[in-house]
Amino acid sequence: MEKMESTEEWEALLSSSSNGDELTMKLIRNGLAKGFKSQKAAGDAGLYSRFLPYHFTESVSNDSFSSLPWQIFANSVAGNSPLQNEAWAFLMDNEDFFLPVPMNPAQCTALEIALWSLIRVDDQRLFELCHSKSGIRLLSIIFDFDSHPDWLREDVMFNIAERILKSNFPNVLVNVASKIGPKSIYFLIDCMSHKIKLKETATGFYVILDVLSCVGRQFASVLEECFTKEISSAGLDHINHFSEIVMLGVDLLYRDYVSYDTTISLKNDDSSSLGDMEFETSQPSSSISEIIHLLAVLDKRIPKKTLVEKTYASSMELQELYNAVVGVKRECVRFIAFICSKFSTAPDLVRHFNGVALIISQANYDDWNPYIREISVLCTRLLLQNNIENQKIIGGLTPITTTHSDALEEAGFTSYINDKGKVVLQPKTAKNSH
């Protein structure tokens, strides 16, 4: 195909495509790939004023599943295209046209490529993408991994995510993903663990805290619902993803940030490393609150698994639920331990959110959460170190009763708490005479 660089040629070609003929549409797509002059001529011929609005509208399109209009759009803004400003206005400011939601992965990929071409080096467009109603809608479309989990995504998605996360407003993307669902949130945290280089930066730290805060809140809510109505396969799938997000998020903190000194300060400066920043108490507050709440729900709803009694599950559904949250309680305690080891104000926040006694109560063996006892002991030490108020809470705790054990019953023993607050183990007959 020869280069078409005249407006007249493009007007004729665009006019002949009104019936959506596949061959003509491919000629347009390939023609736009020829470069700057072809793109400009197509724009002058009405690519954005007539052609694309017509073919993007499902009611007049011969095939709403065709990816050709989307590929034409992507090619029209590729490289140093002179149509980028017009294309951006077409997406963001067009009151007469509403971009349809992609119907298949090919359409979505073309939209992603076009969007990346438009924001790759333009900070103003990036700002508008993250702060306008139209921009948030676009982000909600391309970052929706929950509606179409089987769609394959191109590496350009990582580029878009990295561009936004490294900007001054990474929380926008976290908020968008959290409103969509756990698979979309998981994509972000997975990006950070493999593709996106945010380690040892304030941005990466804040993103992880934001993710854990959002997930903690949603995770606790979904768990509570599981005990009020039948557990659905979709609900169980969400819980599995929430569990993975919590464990991966906490692991990222330890992998990328644990090496810093205890006295760490943070400020909102993307170029600085954690060790150089001033810390504001409000930053980890939400994540601490939500993770403590999640831990409380898990502690209430998920029984400990011990060598004596392997499980308390009364149904296969509950057994699947318990398996889905294996290790989450441990990671919640591990997160609190990390925050307390880094920030001197964190133990006070844990106390404020009623987490001190909760952390101490995790210092038991639990096969669902290997090493939770040891991590809880470490976390308790961090909570009490040079903190008189937390020490008072510990001093005021008294044992209430012992837990039932079938193994002790079968062996003819029982346990109780004596007047001095000590646990006593003795034969049943001796207890009765006592």
UniProtKB/Swiss-Prot annotation:
Induction: Expression is up-regulated during meiosis. Keywords: Cell cycle, Cell division, Cytoplasm, Meiosis, Nucleus. One of its GO terms (cellular component) is nucleus. It comes from the Eukaryota. InterPro entries: Ataxin-10/CTR86_families (IPR051374), Ataxin-10_domain (IPR019156). Its main location: cytoplasm. This is Ataxin-10 homolog. The gene is mug160. It is found in: Cytoplasm; Nucleus. May play a role in the regulation of cytokinesis. Coiled coil: none annotated. GO terms for biological process: cell division; meiotic cell cycle; regulation of cytokinesis. Pfam families: Atx10homo_assoc (PF09759). Belongs to the ataxin-10 family. It comes from Schizosaccharomyces pombe (strain 972 / ATCC 24843).
